Structures are given as structure tokens and as C-alpha cells.
A protein has these predicted regions:
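Catalytic NTP-binding/metal-coordinating core of nucleotidyl cyclase/transferase enzymes
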Residues: 1-43, 50
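Residue-level signature of catalytic and energy-coupling elements of molecular machines
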Residues: 11, 27, 67, 90, ...
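Active-site phosphate-binding and catalytic loops of NTP-dependent enzymes
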Residues: 52-59
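A short glycine-enriched loop-to-beta-strand structural element that forms part of the catalytic core
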Residues: 60-73
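Catalytic-core segments of nucleotide cyclases and related cyclic-nucleotide turnover enzymes
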Residues: 74-95
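Cytosolic regulatory/linker segments at or just downstream of nucleotide-handling modules
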Residues: 96-141
Length: 141
């Protein structure tokens, strides 16, 4: 449980510092929202790096993250809808230490120079194929 608390603490600090908001924690995952896609991308990278520096005994966690831009429906403090499902499917498609983003996020953030197309796939509960991109940090230019 200490590792989960540490991961949540790191994630919350970075998300807030980048102008995002934690919507909820889902077991060992977190759902956050951002107004700015570039800030979401930067936060995603920062969280992945920060979490990989945490250790519990000999264990070093490897986070995976997924981003999607859309118009989810706000219900109280939560968000619902197809775009939330897309974001979850994009995150699930990421490998350890990887940040994936949907085509909508890459386009909205103008981040195509930091993205490499990975694949297109159909996901349950989503009416269209999802195109995902691996996103590399800005400092890797």
C-alpha cells in the first residue's frame, strides 16, 4: 500500500503543477483532466519518469499512460462518455514506461513532431477505430 500512496502522491503533485485535476483513483490507476493537451503530454512524461524512480525493496514500478482529447460529459466531479472510454483504451494499449496519445490529442496539442504512429485498433464501447501514437518527451529533440 505504501507504493500506491507514493505513486498517487507523485501523480497528484505533477498533475496539479501542470494545470490538471485528478478526477479519481481507480485501483492502481488515475484519471485526470487537463484543459491544455501539451500540459497533459508533459505531465504524462513527468509522472512516468517520477514513478520509475520510486522503489519498494527491489521493485521499481513502470507506469503506462494514455491520453485522449474529447468532450466528456461532466457529472458532478466525475466525467463520463465515449471519450472517457477512449482514454482508458489508449492507456490500456500502452506498454511499461510508455505514453500513448490518441490522434485527437496529437492534433489538438500540435504535438505531431513528438509522436510516432503506433497502430489503429477497435475498442469495445467505442464507435470508431482508435489511432494511437507513442509520444516522446520534448527534451529528446
Amino acid at each position: 500500500l505504501q507504493l500506491l500512496r507514493d505513486v498517487n502522491g507523485v501523480t497528484e503533485n505533477i498533475v496539479r503543477s501542470r494545470g490538471g485535476r485528478i478526477v479519481k483513483h481507480l485501483g492502481d490507476g488515475t484519471m485526470a483532466v487537463f484543459i491544455d493537451g501539451v500540459e497533459a503530454i508533459e505531465a504524462g512524461h513527468e509522472v512516468i519518469v517520477a514513478v520509475s524512480a520510486l522503489t519498494v525493496g527491489d521493485y521499481r514500478p513502470q507506469l503506462r499512460a494514455g491520453l485522449h482529447t474529447g468532450e466528456p460529459r461532466a457529472v458532478g466531479d466525475d466525467f463520463l462518455g465515449v471519450d472517457v472510454n477512449v482514454a482508458a483504451r489508449v492507456a490500456a494499449a500502452a506498454g511499461a514506461g510508455e505514453l500513448l496519445a490518441s490522434g485527437a490529442t496529437i492534433e489538438a496539442a500540435g504535438a505531431d513532431r513528438y509522436a510516432t504512429r503506433r497502430r489503429r485498433f477497435r475498442a469495445k464501447g467505442v464507435p470508431r477505430d482508435i489511432e494511437v501514437f507513442a509520444v516522446v518527451p520534448r527534451y529528446s529533440d
